[in-house]
Amino acid sequence: MTSVPIFESVSRFLPPANEDEKFWWKVTGRHMARMMHEAGYPEDRQVECLLFHRFKVVPCLGPRPHSDTPWYKSRVGGGAADGCPINYSWRFGTADRRPHIRNFIEPLGALTNTSADPLNEVATKALLHDYSMTLPNVDLEAFWTFAPHYRPRIIEKADMEKLAGASLLVGAEMSPDSHTIDIKAYMYPRVPSQTSQLLTTILPQAMRDAYGEDVCLDSLNFVHDFMTKDPQGCQLVLTGTTGIDCCKLQDTRVKIYVITRNTSFDHIAAIVTLGGRRPISEELLGQLKALWYELKGAPAELPSSEQLPVQTKPDGSKNPIVVPFYFDIQPRLALPDVKAYIDVSTSPVSDLAAANAVVCHLEQHGSGQNPRAYLNVLKDITPVEELETQKGALAFYSVAVKKNELDITSYFNPQVYKRYFAHEVQLNGQRRSVFE
């Protein structure tokens, strides 16, 4: 575990903290410091973001772990995660842009995991309100308008118990060349019928409430038509997840998340190009195909029209493969932007091999500034031998086309519960029994 001088300097002058906050700061604060150091953030920006993390994120992470089993299994990080309420992303730089660091959290509070707050909304809404009071660029007008449309209507107590779980997450982006913290909120409708009504009822009404009755819904209507009429788009399934920028209404984007179970590259390309309506050069499609095959462990000779080989779990059961995407909806645009997610947590490729493949791709195509700094981060958070032999550190890589190049982001997990005993050794110098 390499020393990070700015983290040590900031820590030296922090006021006393309780044991929970002390733990989360030592683990996740150090992770954030390492990421910003490797990404080349200016020192004043590193200090600013570390202080934000310490006082506006750490207190929301709940009780420190006391075993390798979470007391509340957070939705952050998806299937690859271990229930920890925080994970990170590293958006690789381009020729003219340094990497961008983000974290995603599910705030935990006194009412989390109780019948008083079955959807775990209270702590998240309190945190967002606090951000709107302390961060000048944060505007919650769109969020407060959209959120009621995603809440389940009054239902039977027994049904509510079945639907209990995360309904809101928060993302914080800390750009290196800014003095703002950009906040995003993610909403999860818990009732299945709400998901099926998302494009036809919930989002149109929410957008009219937010922007006015005359708001242009061309981009949203395109997504609906694409998913109901296009032979490739018809294979997409709504997850219900919706992301929204917490900024001025005119700049707010709405992200709609979908999945497909068709893993042929031809299908992936059809979704990314919106059935040819958003043309992408053959060169970039070739790059995306090569990356897709390598991260999924597919043989190079596999025809692009064929499905990926089904993976078998150690217990002999099949490991289903799904491919997530999101559509980026903005009232002023006729067509949505599209981003694809490559799930590496279910891939036969090791986490380290996947990370090396992405870095080699960036180096080969002259993209990014020092992409190997990302490898330094991964190896600092998770030992190399674990990256080589175990899964769980990496969740997804997302890929979009921006300015005629692939814009790639890595999403990864601190594995605070999975690596509980290792953290105990690092923080306390000895392994302690979970029964102490």
Curated annotation (Swiss-Prot):
InterPro entries: Aro_prenylTrfase, Aro_prenylTrfase_DMATS. Pfam families: Trp_DMAT. GO terms for molecular function: prenyltransferase activity. Keywords: Transferase. Its EC number is 2.5.1.-. PANTHER family: INDOLE PRENYLTRANSFERASE TDIB-RELATED, PRENYLTRANSFERASE ASQH1-RELATED. Belongs to the tryptophan dimethylallyltransferase family. This is Prenyltransferase nscD. The lineage of its organism: Eukaryota, Fungi, Dikarya, Ascomycota, Pezizomycotina. The gene is nscD.
